[in-house]
Structures are given as structure tokens and as C-alpha cells.
Amino acid sequence: MFVDSVEIIIASGKGGPGMVSFRREKFVIKGGPDGGDGGDGGDVYFEVDNNTDTLASFRGTKHHKAKNGAPGGTRNCTGKKGEDKIIVVPPGTQVFVDDTLWLDLVEPKKRVLALKGGKGGLGNAHFKGATKQQPTYAQKGLEGVEKCVRLELKLIADIGLVGFPNAGKSTLISTISNAKPKIANYEFTTLVPNLGVVSVDEKSGFLMADIPGIIEGASQGKGLGISFLKHIERTKVLAFVLDASRLDLGIKEQYQRLRLELEKFSPALANKPFGVLLNKCDVVENIDKMTRDFCAFLNLEAQKLEAFDLEPYSGFLHPHLTSDFENDPNEKSALFVLPLSAVSALNAHALKFVLLKALQ
């Protein structure tokens, strides 16, 4: 089950109480105080685990509390510190307190202190003085801290696929990555985001995210709404997947409507570097002309992607990208326009290299 939002209560441990005790030895009638300090309460940490991509494990457990510190002992022995509580979350988890962002947990294996445990109380040995040789008082431990927090997951991926329902995004991610999403010939087959690792060669690869299809009004909550648009906010490059075979809605209209929804949801998201994939090109007549016309529509004076083995349809590359694909970060035009067929894997091999270079 994919879960990307939960509310939990976290609490650090209470400090242990100090000890009231006196030294007892043979031939010593009145030994001095030797009560030890209480142990500190356990701390609460968030730890990022790269092996998980959902918050589903929190659905059945709302309270997450560290252990209390142990009481102080005799002979000035300090009580044991309470056991820490380690809360494991996937990369991209954000922690909110009262709708204010508190922690942003991105880096894998990183452990972040959230709540400090209460300090242990002082034993009676600390309170001996010139006028009070036999103190019978010890401090209580300090209380721990409790917070109600909301965990929100924003998946971390390099490439984010954006498209209408049934555009072929799930088929594409299953073709070029290790992801195995549900695929069927009807809209909204994808109900949750999918992550896939794309291996380009033995040393290179990247992470791709496929979110449920966007419909008009998604930014206002229609369809699956904004609940999944947030998962492409962290991506470095967006890939618009357009259905080149649709007769009721051309690729220009598809692109314009998708971009409008992104702009309404987040201008920063809409301004990310992007490319365009014309899917289902194997069932479209004169796809090369359609591709060139679309480049003109984007005001893209494109150069052919001659550096790649295209099979057999030509793709186009932004002219500001050098032979090494070094791009201008202020450039807002498409980085590439590439016809492909996710079903038959036409141009799928070239797509891996194009996306990898676009990330560099």
C-alpha cells in the first residue's frame, strides 16, 4: 500500500529521578549521602532509509515514544539513559508541526535529532552542605517533550513523467526501468506513483517517477488532484509524455493543458527543465513532420539527435546543448523532443542516453 501522508505523535523519554541514599559501612554510624543521578530520557530521531518509498508502516502505529531514564542508584551510580526511539522514514519525507515545515529529510542514511529526552534528576549527594550533612532530598527527572507531527512524503526522482491518463507513462517506465506498474488500456490504471531505476550502462543510471495521469482541473483537486503532483516537485527534469495517436486532442493541446495545470499548481514546478516525448509514434503517419512541427510550435530551432542510434524515428535536440549536452540553466525551451513507442520500445535505448545527458 502506498501512503504519503500520516499524522503521528512523537515523545522523548522522561528523565529518571535522583536517588536518596546514604553510605553504609561497618563502623560508620552516619555515612554521607551517596544517591546517584537519574538517567536522561531517551531521544527521538528520524532516520532516512533508502529501502522504503512509502509511509504505510505508520498507519497502525500512531504513538512513537522513547524510553524513560532509569532512577539513580546508591554509591553515586547514575541511572541508565532511556533507549532512544529511531523513526525510519523514506527519502523525501517532510515533517510538519501545525502546518509549518519543521524537518526535510532527504539524504539517505542520515539521522536527525527531533526531540531531546528529559534531563535526569540530581541525587541527594549534590545537596550536601556545611549546614546540611544528611540531605533527604533528590530531584525528579525533567519531563520529555511531546509533539503531534504530520509526515508528508515527496518522492525523490531525477526524471518525472507528466501526461494525461492512458498516454503510456506506465508502459514507458516499465520498458526502460525495473518498475513493474499495473498496465491496462483504460484511464487511471496508475493510482499511485511508481519509481523505477533506469540503468544506462554499468556505471550510470537515474531514478524515474511516474505519477497518475493529470486531467484538467487537477491543480484544483479534480481526478486524483494535487495529492500526487507534489511527487514531481523534487525532480530535476520533467518529461511530458504526449499521445501522438490521439485524434480528439492533438499534441499541442495536450502539452498546453498539462503545462497550464503545472503552472496553477506550482510556478516553480512549471519552470523546471523539460523535454517532450511523443509516444505511440509507430501508429502515426508522417511522425517526422509532426515532430518538426511541434519543435516549431515550441520555438525550438532543433538539431537532429545524430549522436544516438534512433530506431528509426528522428528526435531533436536543443541547439544550446553542446555535444556534451551542457545546458544553460536559464534556458526555458525544451531540452529535447523525441518520438518513441513505449510498447515496441522504439527509441527506448536512445531515450535513456538523452535523459541521462539532460541531467548532467
Curated annotation (Swiss-Prot):
Keywords: Cytoplasm, GTP-binding, Hydrolase, Magnesium, Metal-binding, Nucleotide-binding. Its EC number is 3.6.5.-. Residues 157-360 form the OBG-type G domain. Coiled coil: none annotated. One of its GO terms (cellular component) is cytoplasm. Residues 1-156 form the Obg domain. Mg(2+) binds at S170, T190. GO terms for molecular function: GTP binding; GTPase activity; magnesium ion binding. InterPro entries: G_OBG (IPR031167), GTP-bd (IPR006073), GTP-bd_Obg/CgtA (IPR014100), GTP1-OBG_CS (IPR006074), GTP1_OBG_dom (IPR006169), GTP1_OBG_dom_sf (IPR036726), OBG_GTPase (IPR045086), P-loop_NTPase (IPR027417). Belongs to the TRAFAC class OBG-HflX-like GTPase superfamily. OBG GTPase family. HAMAP family: GTPase_Obg. An essential GTPase which binds GTP, GDP and possibly (p)ppGpp with moderate affinity, with high nucleotide exchange rates and a fairly low GTP hydrolysis rate. Plays a role in control of the cell cycle, stress response, ribosome biogenesis and in those bacteria that undergo differentiation, in morphogenesis control. This is GTPase Obg. It comes from Helicobacter pylori (strain P12). The lineage of its organism: Bacteria, Pseudomonadati, Campylobacterota, Epsilonproteobacteria, Campylobacterales.
